[in-house]
Design a protein with these regions (language model features):
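PRPP-associated nucleotide enzymes
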Residues: 1-196
Length: 196
């Protein structure tokens, strides 16, 4: 695998394209799921392939190069549920703690902060344990996929409630044609971008 990195200077985004294989080559697309008109990119089919190890390693290297070598990153936050896989791998490789942001109603003890956001097909609420992050922390938010950016931006607001600073986002796949203007302005490292 050879990584070609194209850095968009103004937005701070980094798109990595795999010269031989793209993550979507290993991802099943399910049409009209979870509701009609929505296409679901099933990253579980990528996780089940040896190619996932290479994708995770390359994403980790780019994140580490961009953030952690300068000491600009103290934690990785993963968004439930597939963001747990991506985020935990990034945190482990980089050598920083991993924090989970969960969906409201999940088993998460203690006092919680919450943030509600709109989905393409409804709304949802995310929670984080109060006191798990603080003012000195600098956080990267990780998920499998960014579409509108609703859950990513809600997680950003949630992390900011703790007093921590969000330095950027990382994902395996970015559906750029669905990104809101707010999401387009955020620093993002992604393995593959779909423009449509």
């Amino acid at each position: 695998w050879v990584m070609i990195v194209n850095k968009a200077e103004k937005s701070g985004r980094v798109y990595m394209s795999l010269e031989k294989t793209k993550p979507t080559d290993y991802m099943r697309t399910v049409q009209d799921y979870p509701v009609e008109g929505v296409n679901f990119y099933d990253i579980n089919s990528l996780f089940a392939q040896p190619a996932w190890n290479q994708v995770a390693a390359e994403l980790s290297v780019e994140v580490q190069t961009r953030y952690n070598r300068t000491g600009d990153l103290s934690h990785v936050v993963g968004i439930e549920s597939r963001g747990f896989v991506v985020g935990a791998v990034l945190a482990s490789v980089i050598g920083v703690p991993f924090i989970m942001v969960r969906k409201k109603g999940s088993k998460y003890p203690g006092s919680l902060l919450q943030e509600t956001y709109a989905l393409e097909y409804g709304e949802d609420t995310l929670v984080i344990q109060e006191g798990i992050l603080g003012y000195t922390n600098r956080v990267l938010i990780a998920d499998d996929l960014v579409a509108t950016g609703g859950s990513a931006l809600a997680t950003k607001r949630l992390v900011e409630q703790t007093g921590a600073t969000v330095v950027g986002f990382a994902s395996v796949l970015n559906l750029a044609y669905l990104n809101t203007d707010d999401m387009k302005s955020q620093p993002l490292i992604t393995c593959e971008e779909i423009i449509k």
